[in-house]
Amino acid sequence: MAIKVFADGANLEGMLDMYENGNVQGFTTNPSLMKKGGVTDYRAFAKEVLAHITDVSVSFEVFADDVEAMEVEAREIATWADNVYVKIPCVTTKGESTAELVRKLSADGIKVNVTTIFTPEQVDEMVEAVDTETPSIISLFAGRIADTGVDPIPFMTESVKKAAIKPNCEVLWASTRELINIYQAEACGCQIITVPNSILAKRKNIGRDPYEVSLDTVRGFAKDIAALGFHILP
């Protein structure tokens, strides 16, 4: 497949295992993953990750919620390593756009990963903001859009077309829910998809005969029935 698979991660051991096995082509992190992974020192964790992972991109997110403080944090994060992308949410919690900050950072040669994008208007704004020469990523939360009952495929496909005017801007399918999303993302033209470990583990099922899957499922039910000791007839 042409699409690059990135892993969501905040566990160093797991990240290094995937990196060393060549299972992924990049990594992303976010505050929620840090909390779940028990990270207590953001800078120390990032520096340790970057000491081992040097030749694929790793995205680290700013923590501030106002544009001025975001800029200070972003410029600091950008100094950590050449393969770092700075994750910038497209809006603050107050709904203030970060497009001008993205424009400034990108123009200064800082690689940004603009995240939490959900609408066509946000895509338009951020594609316009990123620099033509500086590599950038726009992360579109296809899975969370699907969670609202809306098919994300048309939005993703149209967004890829919009981003094509900036040759160094890559579109990332975020919040992946199923293995088939990898194929859907590639069909839409996305250059990157982030995939959680639970779904990466399912790649071993690719190409399996559906009949064999059916048998395995029935055998699993039978095993659970035996373990429960249930009976219908006396």
Where are these regions (language model features)?
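Active-site beta->alpha loop and helix N-cap motifs at the rims of alpha/beta catalytic domains
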Residues: 2-16, 20-24, 28-108, 142-145
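C-terminal extensions of enzymes
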Residues: 232-234
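Flexible domain-boundary/linker segments
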Residues: 35, 44, 122, 202-203
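Catalytic alpha/beta core domains of metabolic enzymes, predominantly
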Residues: 96, 103, 110-201, 207-229
